C-alpha cells in the first residue's frame, strides 16, 4: 500500500519518478505526487494530483515541465484523511526546507501533532505524514544535521513507516529510513534510487540494498551510506535481482492477471525444481533440517487473504500425509487471541510480498514465544524472509496484478513439499510412497497447462453470467478451501457479491438465500465426498439455482445435476487444488473483462497490505 520512488543522479528525475510510480500502481493508490529539486535555482517544486497517475503525468507534461536531477515521488492510499490533492504526498514544511514521502501509519500522530502545535507549527492536511515531516523539521532546527533529526524523529514515532526525505540545505542528497514498511535502495552508473518494491527500479538497475528496521540511508549520485538509529555507519551487502525486467511487463496479454494465470505452469515447475533434486526433496536452501521436522508435534499456518486459503489446503494435506496436527489462523486475528503455542511446533508464515503487516506481527509474536518460524515468501530479502528462522522461497517471479494467481499456486507447492518431507522424516510414509507423491507432483505443470487449454468454455460461461448479482461456491474438505479462493477471485475483481460455504452447512441457514437465477458453483473433486456434495448441489438446484459443477475427468454423472460442467485432470487428491483453481481464476477474470472493469487494479484493493 502506497508507493515510494526517489532518484538522485545525472538524468532528469521527474520522468524516472513517474515511470517508477507506474510500476507500483498494483500496490493501490488514490492520488500521486512528486517533488523535484532544481539544482540551478535550489528551488523544490511539488506537483500533486488526485486520481490516476496519468493525471499527474499530464500536469507535468510527462515530467518534462519539472526540471531537476533529484526528486522523490509517491502514490498514496488514504489512511488518515480523504483522497485529495491536499492530502497527497509529498508533504513539506511551510518554507519547503524539508520535503518527505511516507508509506505506513503513525499510531501516535495525535500526540505528536499536539506537541508540534505547542511549538508553533500549523497544519494544512489531515495526514499523519505531515506530522512526520514537521517532526523531522523540529529536530533539524534543534540539531542542524539531517541524520540526527531523522534518528530523533524515528525514536518518537510509533507505528510503521518508510520515508524518503529531501532537505533544502543539503542539495544533491536524499535520505531514506524505515521501520516495518518495505524500502529498497538501488544503484546504477548514473545515480542512486529508493523504491518501495523492485519493479519500480528494475528497468534502471538490478543492484539493490535492503535497508533494515530502524536504519537510515544517505544517497548521493555516486555514493550510498547506511546508518543505524544511533547514527553509526553500518555496512550493507549489495544484492543482485535475478528477475528479468520483461517478466514485469504484459508480454502481449491484455492484462497482467491473464499473463500471470498462463505463467502458472512455469512458476509451479520452477518452484518444484528448486527443491526436488534427483527425485528427492532437498530443503538445504531453506535452512530447515530433518532434525527440525523429526520431533514436530504441531504446525501453525498464519496468513491473510489467498495465502490463508493456501493454509487451509495445507492443513488438509499436512494432516493427511504427515499426520501432524495443523492450525490455520488469519494473521490479523492470530496475536489477538493469545495463541497457546506448544513446544516442538513450527509457525509457517505465508506471504507473497513478505511485507504483509499482520503476518509480520504474527511472526514476531511467534519468535517472542520461542517458536521457530518458516517463511513462505516470493520476494527475496523481504522483511518476513529476513526475520524468519527458515525461508522457503516460491519462484513465481514478479506478480503485478492485485489478484494473486501464480503466487497462490507456488504457495500450494510449498505446502505439498512440507507435507511430503515431514512425512518421510517422521517415518509416516516409506520411500516408495514418497517417490510416488513427488513424481505425481512433478506432473502438475502439464496438468495445469491442459486445464488452461480449455479456457474458451470458461470464457463463454463467464460472459453469459457476467451480470449475476450473487454467486455462491460450495464444497467439502479441500473443495471448501478451493471454493473460498474461487469466491475471493470472483468478488475482488468483478465486484459481484460472492460467498463460499462448506456444503454441509447449507441447511444451517445459508440455503435461505437461494432463489431463482442464483448462480451456484459446486466443487466436487474429492472421491469420498463426491456423492455428499452432489446431494447438496441437488438441494440448491431444486430451489431455483443455476448450477455449475467442477470436478475431475471421469465424474461425468455430475451432468445429471449441473447445468454446466467443467472437468480438470485427475491427480492425487492432495494436489487437486492446483488444477481445480485454474477454471475459477479464469472465471473471475473473464467476468471482470465482460463487465469492462480494471482487472489488474480493482477498486479499494492493494497488492501488498503493509499497514494493519
Role assignments for model-derived ranges:
Residues 157-191, 466-492, 529, 534:
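Acidic/histidine-rich
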Residues 1-250, 254, 266-297, 336, ...:
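Conserved short alpha-helical segments that host acidic/polar catalytic motifs at enzyme active sites
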Residues 294-436, 440-443, 523-569, 587, ...:
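Glycine-rich phosphate-binding loops that contact phosphosugars or nucleotide phosphates
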Residues 231, 546, 561, 571-612:
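Generic C-terminus detector
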Residues 69, 73-86, 277-290, 314-350, ...:
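Glycine-rich oxoanion-binding loops at beta->alpha junctions
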Residues 264-268, 272-300, 390-519, 592-612:
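Active-site phosphate/pyrophosphate-binding segments
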Amino acid at each position: 500500500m502506497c508507493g515510494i520512488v526517489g532518484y538522485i543522479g545525472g538524468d532528469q528525475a521527474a520522468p524516472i519518478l513517474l515511470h517508477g510510480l507506474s510500476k507500483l500502481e498494483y500496490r493501490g493508490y488514490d492520488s500521486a505526487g512528486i517533488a523535484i529539486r532544481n539544482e540551478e535555482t535550489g528551488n523544490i517544486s511539488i506537483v500533486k494530483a488526485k486520481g490516476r497517475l496519468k493525471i499527474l503525468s499530464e500536469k507535468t507534461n510527462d515530467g518534462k515541465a519539472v526540471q531537476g536531477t533529484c526528486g522523490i515521488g509517491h502514490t498514496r492510499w488514504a489512511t488518515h484523511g480523504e483522497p485529495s490533492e491536499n492530502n497527497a504526498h509529498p508533504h513539506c514544511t511551510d518554507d519547503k526546507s524539508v520535503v518527505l514521502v511516507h508509506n505506513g501509519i503513525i499510531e501516535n500522530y495525535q500526540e505528536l501533532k499536539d506537541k508540534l502545535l505547542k511549538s508553533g507549527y500549523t497544519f494544512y492536511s489531515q495526514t499523519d505524514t505531515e506530522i512526520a515531516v514537521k517532526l523531522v523539521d523540529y529536530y533539524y532546527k534543534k540539531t542542524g544535521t539531517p541524520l540526527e533529526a531523522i534518528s530523533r524523529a524515528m525514536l518518537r514515532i510509533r507505528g510503521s513507516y518508510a520515508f524518503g526525505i529531501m532537505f533544502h540545505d543539503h542539495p544533491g542528497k536524499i535520505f531514506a529510513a524505515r521501520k516495518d514498511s518495505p524500502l529498497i535502495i538501488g544503484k546504477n552508473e548514473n545515480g542512486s534510487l529508493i523504491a518501495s518494491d523492485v519493479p519500480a527500479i528494475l528497468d534502471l538497475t538490478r543492484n539493490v540494498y535492503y535497508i533494515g528496521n530502524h536504519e537510515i540511508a544517505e544517497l548521493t549520485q555516486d555514493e550510498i551510506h547506511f546508518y543505524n538509529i544511533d547514527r553509526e555507519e553500518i555496512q550493507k551487502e549489495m544484492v543482485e535481482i535475478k528477475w528479468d525486467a520483461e517478466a514485469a511487463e504484459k508480454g502481449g496479454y491484455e492484462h497482467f492477471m491473464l499473463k500471470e494465470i498462463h505463467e502458472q505452469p512455469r512458476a509451479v515447475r520452477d518452484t518444484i525444481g528448486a527443491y526436488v533434486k534427483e527425485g528427492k526433496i532437498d530443503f538445504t536452501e531453506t535452512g530447515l533440517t530433518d532434525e527440525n521436522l523429526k520431533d514436530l508435534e504441531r504446525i501453525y499456518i498464519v496468513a491473510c487473504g489467498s495465502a490463508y486459503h493456501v493454509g487451509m489446503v495445507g492443513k488438509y494435506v499436512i494432516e493427511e500425509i504427515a499426520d501432524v496436527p495443523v492450525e490455520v489462523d488469519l494473521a490479523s486475528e492470530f496475536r489477538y487471541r493469545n495463541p497457546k503455542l506448544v513446544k516442538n511446533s513450527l509457525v509457517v508464515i505465508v506471504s507473497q510480498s513478505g511485507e504483509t503487516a499482520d503476518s509480520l506481527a504474527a511472526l514476531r509474536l511467534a519468535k517472542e514465544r520461542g517458536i521457530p518460524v518458516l517463511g513462505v515468501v516470493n520476494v527475496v530479502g523481504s522483511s518476513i524472509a529476513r526475520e524468519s528462522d527458515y525461508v522457503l522461497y516460491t519462484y513465481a517471479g514478479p506478480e503485478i496484478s492485485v489478484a494473486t494467481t501464480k503466487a497462490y499456486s507456488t504457495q500450494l507447492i510449498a505446502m505439498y513439499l512440507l507435507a511430503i518431507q515431514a512425512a518421510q522424516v517422521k517415518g509416516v510414509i516409506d520411500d516408495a510412497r514418497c517417490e510416488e507423491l513427488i513424481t505425481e507432483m512433478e506432473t502438475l505443470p502439464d496438468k495445469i497447462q491442459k486445464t488452461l487449454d480449455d479456457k474458451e468454455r470458461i470464457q463463454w460461461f463467464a460472459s453469459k453470467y457476467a451480470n449475476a448479482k450473487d454467486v455462491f461456491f460450495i464444497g467439502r474438505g479441500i473443495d471448501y478451501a478451493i471454493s473460498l479462493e474461487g469466491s475471493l477471485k470472483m468478488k475482488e475483481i468483478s465486484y459481484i457479491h460472492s460467498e463460499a460455504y462448506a456444503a454441509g452447512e447449507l441447511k444451517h441457514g445459508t440455503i435461505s438465500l437461494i432463489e431463482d437465477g442464483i448462480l451456484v458453483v459446486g466443487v466436487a473433486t474429492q472421491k469420498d465426498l463426491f456423492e455428499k456434495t452432489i446431494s447438496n448441489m441437488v438441494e440448491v438446484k431444486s430451489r431455483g439455482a443455476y448450477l455449475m459443477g467442477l470436478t475431475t475427468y471421469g465424474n461425468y454423472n455430475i451432468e445429471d445435476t449441473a447445468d454446466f460442467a467443467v472437468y480438470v485432470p485427475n491427480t492425487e487428491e492432495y494436489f487437486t487444488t492446483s488444477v481445480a483453481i485454474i477454471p475459477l481464476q479464469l472465471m473471475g477474470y473473464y467476468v471482470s473483462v465482460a463487465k469492462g472493469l480494471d482487472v489488474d487494479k480493482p477498486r479499494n484493493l492493494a497488492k501488498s497490505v503493509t499497514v494493519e
